[in-house]
């Protein structure tokens, strides 16, 4: 890839990451301020605050890793740094996957019109479980990330004696990263992904049936209730697309199919971090509280700029 084109994609990645950092930081500041003021948060706000905080940290780690290793791509000393990045990367991505899954479950139990006794029981109990589910997700993700790091520690430690063992250690590390990590990630992340897909599919189906009934009961497409359901469906479908895109891109990224020396590395990084950067804006513009504060800040900034 030509240097100018590579610089363009690096700049695009930086802008996308900075926008995501700003959006996630905004969510954390607004909801964190409310938490400090009132001493409590609604279950939805708990999940949004936690998701925003971990995504904020994830994007900082991602930017730091990409630019550090692009500057030290020929230095072997970066391998140890790479493994510590992987520890954080696995942990943060696992946590955000779980938080997105709990967010979809909360939407499902609050909105879906399902009369099954088990669902009604879950609808009543789930909001009270949210703090413990968030804490449990963090602990489980941390333990799994440590186990993945520990299992492969001996292989990575051999980097220190690579000059005495030829290319065998390098080949072992490459085989481990290409075959073991993607399989482990697929198994681990498939659990929250399954929870997400089941809950989001139930909710989309419930909203779709309800919207269809309203349209066939003489409700116009311009009816406020119909429009609200249509907006909710669009929000959920975009949430589903971004979640699946993030899941697939991270699994593929774990294969190291596109290395840093590859011409398509920076366009691929844009795809990997696209969901983390775009989804916060979707959350902001579909949450009345966050949307209200956002427009207030925008008006203040506009007034300050004009003055």
UniProtKB/Swiss-Prot annotation:
Keywords of this entry: G-protein coupled receptor, Glycoprotein, Membrane, Receptor, Sensory transduction, Taste, Transducer, Transmembrane, Transmembrane helix
Gene3D superfamilies: Rhodopsin 7-helix transmembrane proteins
Residues passing through the membrane, by range: 8-28, 41-61, 89-109, 130-150, 184-204, 235-255, 265-285
Domain of life: Eukaryota
Glycosylation, residue list: 152, 167
GO CC terms, sorted: plasma membrane
A single GO molecular function term of this UniProt record: G protein-coupled receptor activity
Pfam families registered for this protein in UniProt: TAS2R (PF05296)
Compartments (UniProt record): Membrane
Topological domains annotated Cytoplasmic: 29-40, 110-129, 205-234, 286-307
InterPro entries to which the protein is assigned, alphabetical: TAS2R
Extracellular side: 1-7, 62-88, 151-183, 256-264
Family label: Belongs to the G-protein coupled receptor T2R family.
Name the record gives this protein: Taste receptor type 2 member 41
Gene: TAS2R41
